[in-house]
Amino acid sequence: MTPTVPELEFAQATAFESNVPPLFPGRAGPDDGADRLRLRLAVRGWARPLDLIAASNSPDDVMAILGALAAEVETAVQTRPNQWYLSLAARKRELARRDDAQLRAAASASVPGDDDDPVLHAMRIALADAEPTLSALGTDVLAALGNACDWLGERWRHAVGAQRIAGELASRALDADLRRMTRDPMVGRSHRDTLARLIGFATAATQTPLSVAYVYGGGGAGKTTLLSFLQRDLSQRAEPVPVVRIDFDEPAIDPTRMVTLNIALVEQLARSVPAVCDRASDMLPALRDTALVQHDAGLSRGGPRKRIKSSRPESMLKAESVASQAASDEGSILYRLLAPDVVAGPILIVFDTAELVLAQSDHVASSLVSWLGFLHNEAGARDLRLVIAGRDPPDDPDLGHAANSLLSRLKDTGARIETPIGLPELDPAEAQQLLRNCGVDDPTAAAEAAAAVPGNPLLLRITADALLQGEAELRESVRRAHRDSRIDADSARNYLLRRVVAHVRDPIARPYVLAATYSPVVTAKLLEEVVIPAVDRSEREPGPGIPANKKAATAKAKRVFDALASTYWLTRQTLRSETVPFNREIRAFALKLLAATPEGALLERDVRQSAAIHHLRRRSADDRALALYHLAVLGHPYTVPRDLASVQTVLRDVIEELPADLRNRLAPPVGSVAPGVARGVARSSIDDMSDSDWQRYLEGDERSKRAGEGAQMVKADRAREALDLYLARPTRPPGLPPTFVIQAQADLGEWDEGIADIDAILEREADDWLARKSIGPEALSRIYWITRLALQAYGRLSTPHAMLLRNASETATGPGLSTLPALIAVAETMSGEPIMAGRMRSQALKTDAAGRTLLCPIHGHLPETIELFDAGIAVVQSDWRQRMIQLAPARLIRANEAHLRDLQSRLDALHAKPIAQVNQLFNKMRTGIAVEPTTMAGLNSAVLLLRGLTPEFYRPLREALLALCENGVASPMMRHAVDPLFERMSIRPAEMEPATFYRRLSNNPNAWCTAFIVYADRCRLLPGLCESLARYADSPKSRRIASSFLAWDKALCRGTSSDWGQPAKTRK
């Protein structure tokens, strides 16, 4: 915050108090004084500016000095009156322009308050020659030292860097947290027995690479405390067991992006494993760069009602390329990190509150299993122990599907699965012990509370707080409730706020969470017409958030609904995007606590009466069942529908809340839950889902922007699994599959399987696309994939297909202008006929498709100048710059001489380095190079500058290689095709050394076949590989894919080839 005028006036009035000697001798004016004040602030934290201004300045000069810096500082009038803190940008500028002597002089000047300034202390350490001893520094100074490392940048002089400092801070925070959580002895015989079992699980000898234990209990059951005791015990052993805790409640953790899990793994192991700590300073920046690239490519997790970004066509190629390279890049970074010679003994990994992510999608469970496989195959882990802390019992037929799905997948990989362990409530004696540990010394009060309050450890701790910390009147109210064997209202409210409401991230939605639980399932309409008005009526004064009109009310209800839908701890995902069911156990406990509050009874009656009216006005079977439920609970007359089966289905989770006579009528068990409002993915399977639910699950829901399981699988490079899932139960007529199936076919190189009939798709859907004013993203994606499949499979387009693209190129806006040109350019070069409209062509010349567009000889007029990015021009060969000098226009070489020399130097430096560095370099290359197409001397010059990469073939060619190796063992045919390319890679990363490559291939064939294809493309060697495959491969599929690539390359190179040939410079 900028200093106020009164602060400046105060500074002027008291300026004479300052007696600081000047840094440099001589009388200084206001400008010099401001400069000196800025320097002194740059090496300090919060400081009084008056203490830092020389006493020789006049009041007018002081006022001018303070005014000159007013915009560069932060203030906190309430908490730090008359103190300033130099802003980050101003601080970095000031530190950068000063030499070390000036900074030391500014830091050595002593003024009041300096002894307590952690920033000044840290800056003195940073500027000193002596290496700091981190363990000897206070936590506040250590944190400031981490900031100083960032502020000084390349001028940081010590071997101990930001990563070591951050690791020390994290270790201290963890130690403090463990001390807090384990301060009192563990209470509860079952809890102690479970701890003993988990310690034995984590330390016992085993021959199994992966062992799994599942611990479950409701909110507040003590799982976090149990895990803290476990981690403390393992860390204090003579041979400590390192623990990696993956907390799915952390926003940075995305289980579908392996890199986020790997970052957490390295960060935590660096604190306890010296060998990992030594490598962390290199690994973590590389992993974070990889994470940033994946995020920019749209590979972040999408919520249940949020379309996954990379399903939009404009980011598909980027996302596809980045996702394909992720496993090999991260394998390159973390290679053998967890091998027995690095980490001796077992490693314990904890998945905390697994339901937070498992409930989102079956795809998440598969991603987590894949990550554990990666740790074994690439990181070299040979003894992993996994503890999964969950909420729901895996054997519960209604709630346990998510946990059971993960455990089943783990078992299929050969993991040893321990018997799941449940944490029960504490019995009254144990509850009394917990209350005594919390400070409730009165045995009568402890006994009364233990008898009245459920044995949930968190609720008991909250009760202890109420008994100890409240006013006398509150304490007496609590005691009175306990004597009456009731839960006291204060503890009930606090638990609900801390364990239920707090889980909902959106603050706008939180006031309505508890009222919504009176219905077992909510819709946006129910929230709008029932829940939100009931809560707002219960407030004494209308809040500012109450909508003023129908449109605002609908928008608010939708926001609350989305917040509930994304709170997986509290609700279950449903295939019907318009409904959200609550978790049965959590809802039942919440209602029990709400009943203990006086306001709960009033709110319940209001909500239930309004909900009954809401459902009676509707005619569906679900509404009739829910109206019956609310009327029965209120004690009002009700009529039981004749169709008892539908009522049993909807009310299955709430049958215990009904009056005895109605409960008896509905008591017959339901063999399976039909698709109703309370039915979610967690209780569904291929066999028992309705056709509509299965289609929503597989394809998603465009109206609610919910991504389908199939699209998520293909996006994550699991095309085979997605295709098999669809073929097990198709959702559309033969020949007309959803888009993700077409993409899966294209990726797998299975182009003639009779699954997608492109002519039938065009006949059925093209007229509808062309009739629209603009083509939406989903239609555009479909057009893209049928075009790509047609060009790869057949090398041509039918007349209706070409006409569709011609019309689309004339009307496309937004993403279409950047998505289709790369494919249309291929189609034009193959057919010799113009397709792309001038408007799209002009736009394409500003995108990554510019090179292909210019290679097409059909369009006569060439622009005077276009700008190409260096990442698209550069070829990873040691003679690339030499060929550029020989073939590229002389003016281009002169204008970019220094950059080309630097770029070749950086390419040469990749030799023998991890392959991850190749992609990291190219991901950062975004320098524009101006090209004059009319000056290109012939076809060789054009191909060198414009050909670029062919990411459309990375996955199909990967499949072509996989067909030539079994269980990671390359066949002689594969070696015959691949080995010559190693010799022609004049810059060869470590993993492209033949012996290393084949060893890595045996551990992870998918990842390293992909890595080979991508790197060969960067070296312009794919044509040679495909020539060999097309001629000699014994797999028809491999020959077909290779021939298709050669046809593309020949068309784009106007009858020639883009193959680099034998480099002029080779390296051994």
Curated annotation (Swiss-Prot):
The keyword Hydrolase applies. ATP binds at residues 217-224. It is an enzyme of class 3 (hydrolase). Keywords: Antiviral defense, ATP-binding, Hydrolase, Nucleotide-binding. GO terms for molecular function: ATP binding; hydrolase activity. One of its GO terms (biological process) is defense response to virus. Its EC number is 3.6.4.-. The keyword Amino-acid biosynthesis does not apply. InterPro entries: P-loop_NTPase. Involved in defense against bacteriophages. When this probable 4 gene operon (bGSDM-FE772_23060-FE772_23065-FE772_23070) is inserted into E.coli it provides nearly 100-fold protection against phages T5 and T6 and about 8-fold against phage T4. The operon without bGSDM no longer protects against phage. Probably a nucleotide hydrolase, possibly of ATP. This is Probable ATPase FE772_23070. The lineage of its organism: Bacteria, Pseudomonadati, Pseudomonadota, Gammaproteobacteria, Lysobacterales.
